[in-house]
């Protein structure tokens, strides 16, 4: 599932590592803090 809890900075870093923008992270990874 793309819905998960995580550190927003780590989520952004992870998505950028996959060649995605942080907006992709917010919309798909659904990073919601801890």
Curated annotation (Swiss-Prot):
Instruction: Give the main location.
Output: secreted
Sorted alphabetically, the keyword list is: Disulfide bond, Ion channel impairing toxin, Neurotoxin, Potassium channel impairing toxin, Secreted, Toxin, Voltage-gated potassium channel impairing toxin
Which cysteines bridge via disulfide bonds? 6-25, 11-29, 15-31
An MF annotation (GO) of this entry: toxin activity
Q: In which tissues is it expressed?
A: Expressed by the venom gland.
List the subcellular locations.
Secreted
Of the GO CC terms on this record, one is: extracellular region
The family line of this record is: Belongs to the short scorpion toxin superfamily. Potassium channel inhibitor family. Alpha-KTx 21 subfamily.
This molecule's function is given as: Toxin that blocks voltage-gated potassium channels (Kv).
Domain writeup: Has the structural arrangement of an alpha-helix connected to antiparallel beta-sheets by disulfide bonds (CS-alpha/beta).
Q: Which protein are we looking at?
A: Potassium channel toxin
Which species is this UniProt entry from?
Tityus metuendus (Scorpion)
């Amino acid at each position: 599932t793309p819905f998960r809890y995580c550190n927003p900075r780590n989520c952004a870093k992870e998505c950028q590592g996959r060649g995605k923008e942080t907006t992709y992270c917010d919309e798909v990874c659904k990073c919601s803090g801890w």
